[in-house]
């Protein structure tokens, strides 16, 4: 079995692959102050619930956009799994991803892993949208090379900025509103955040297609992918565990 960890700024997604299938997965809050023992005990508890043991795991691979958390996770892997974790961007593992980008070192590990998984499954050209703390758009060109992208504030950041900086506006939940025109302040905010974000997605995808002169398949991943994709006119496929699949694929190709 392979244990995979996708560490984001807000959430960390964990998964176990058995014979190529994602059999278990969990989403936890990212805590950059946790020690290796706290991570070990948390994972032990999650494993116990699914009747898994540390001994079942034969490999560990990590993608992280939060550098301070890596030391604790790598030590946890050694102490609890007795395995040296593979770390995307740090361990000398090949990703088998072609690059048409001037400085590949600045690309986030999660974006690389997503691109590996998406190109393996869907070919090219592609637009990969990852709805995380930041929303990222990655363009894979006709030669199946990573060719750049767009980074915008995530929907949660946009929502928090609204109520944090406007003293009379309340905190709201992200959900589809009943109408576009709100009849209350909360309804108006919900509509603005939700439909404003969908407009951003559809608008940026159209601009990418127009600029590149291609008709790429558009893949969405991340915690809010299903919610946004349901109303978006431009998203073709939702892959909620794209990053976990990419980690598994990279590990398998290197072993």
From Swiss-Prot:
Gene3D superfamilies: 3.30.420.40. SUPFAM superfamilies: Actin-like ATPase domain (SSF53067). Its EC number is 2.7.1.33. It comes from the Bacteria. CDD domains: ASKHA_NBD_PanK-III (cd24015). It is an enzyme of class 2 (transferase). Its cofactor is NH4(+); K(+). One of its GO terms (molecular function) is pantothenate kinase activity. ATP binds at residues 6-13, 133. Keywords: ATP-binding, Coenzyme A biosynthesis, Cytoplasm, Kinase, Metal-binding, Nucleotide-binding, Potassium, Transferase. Pathway: Cofactor biosynthesis; coenzyme A biosynthesis; CoA from (R)-pantothenate: step 1/5. It catalyses: (R)-pantothenate + ATP = (R)-4'-phosphopantothenate + ADP + H(+). A monovalent cation. Ammonium or potassium. Belongs to the type III pantothenate kinase family. Homodimer. Catalyzes the phosphorylation of pantothenate (Pan), the first step in CoA biosynthesis. This is Type III pantothenate kinase. It comes from Oceanobacillus iheyensis (strain DSM 14371 / CIP 107618 / JCM 11309 / KCTC 3954 / HTE831).
